[in-house]
Amino acid sequence: DVLALLIEHFSGMTTAEFLKDRIFDPLDMKDTGYNISKENKGRWMPVHNLDKQGNLINSKTQLPTEGNTIYGGTHGLFSSASDYMKFCQMLLNKGQFKGKHLLSPKTVDIMTMNQVGNLYEAAGQGFGLGFGVTTDLADSKALGSVGQYYWSGAYCTYFFIDPKEELIVILMSQLQPYNNYYGEKMRQMVYQSLITKY
């Protein structure tokens, strides 16, 4: 959220305006923003909980979908799987998407390398500029590749990008409380299904 304040200070725009101008519009991310348009409201999945029997139920706590004026740097965005795929594809392409250069390749390299040494609490993992980063497969005890980067959202959304395998995987969810079970399970199934190219 400090980054959002810095964006507003140095750009003279709100974080919402800056992200729309510099990221969402160039990537044609029409479904992404801090508020949901009235025509898209029916496409939004409400937040769910599990009851004691494990059944999905609508959560009593729902995010406001319109009228939001606080633009966090770490939370508050609505998006779709197809929009998020465009963002991830740009990262996998080292900052380029359909001929547009949003970031330099070196910027993406810096964003996706471990910046914290061994301070990150998960073994075999580090932290880049906005992403968890796999640094050691044996220590991480997870399938993947060194250099894979990932993150999750508050309602169990999850994505990872594996540059070595040229792979993007996105899991969209609206489930609380946060639990990484499905993200880890999905990653395991994806890597178990990969076939070596000869």
Question: Language-model segments: which ranges?
Answer:
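Short, surface-exposed loop or secondary-structure junction motifs
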Residues: 1-146
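Residue-level recognition of short loop/turn positions
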Residues: 53, 164-165
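Short, surface-exposed beta-strand/loop micro-motifs that present aromatic residues
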Residues: 148, 155-164
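Short, well-ordered beta-strand elements
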Residues: 159-160, 166-175
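A short, polar/charged loop-to-alpha-helix boundary motif
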Residues: 178-188
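Conserved H-D interstitial segment of serine endopeptidase catalytic domains
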Residues: 191-192
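Short, basic, low-complexity termini and linkers enriched in Ser/Thr/Gly/Pro
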Residues: 196-198
